[in-house]
Amino acid sequence: MNELEKKLRDHVAFIYGEEPAEQITTRILERLARFQEANPKLASSSPENRVSEHDFILITYGDMVQQEGQPPLQTLAAFLQKHLGDVVSTIHILPFFPYSSDDGFSVIDYRAVNPALGNWDNVARLGADFRLMFDAVVNHISSQSVEFQGFLKGNPDFQEFFTVTEPGTDLSRVFRPRATPVVTPYETVNGEKLVWTTFSADQIDLNYRNPDVLIEVIDILLFYASQGAD
């Protein structure tokens, strides 16, 4: 085990405890190895000096610039290249995935581009002229996602993906800038469950106490890197 792998294992052990640390670390390293094999150029790039005071980063939704008959991401790429190509170095695209609420921040499918905006080819075209940042919404997921619908239907793969609270739990000390309840009742095949929903009833918090959630999110982030996220 090299120094980086040891550091990774130490972090995993701190979060999940010593007993499962070895297995979880191995699962993460397996995914990193597959990513390195599939993306050798990305895997060999240096993480140092990637951002400096000379960078100019533009943050935008994918549909801020539109032209009839053209995918908004395609229009955005052409507009930015023409008008800001010599000024902006990086484009931070706010969530551009299929979603159900909150202007994109309730993601239904992390690996798809919202068809109303375009497709992955349009994202790649934007990345040909600019470095890209993707907005990864990995604290919660849409209630319409495959994962949460699987939870409701009793799919064992997703029963620990979300945080379920026992009735009567005292949550009076939980403070957040939202007027909605912190837990939302959902009817499942196993009866009503109180599910943790920090932001809204449609945005279901992911349960990182379950290492499977961490592994899935790592897979998603590596996928984003393979699609041009810098």
Residues covered by each model-derived region:
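Structured mid-domain segments that build the active-site/substrate or prosthetic-cofactor binding neighborhood
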Residues: 230
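Acidic/aromatic-lined carbohydrate-recognition and catalytic surfaces
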Residues: 3-218, 222, 226
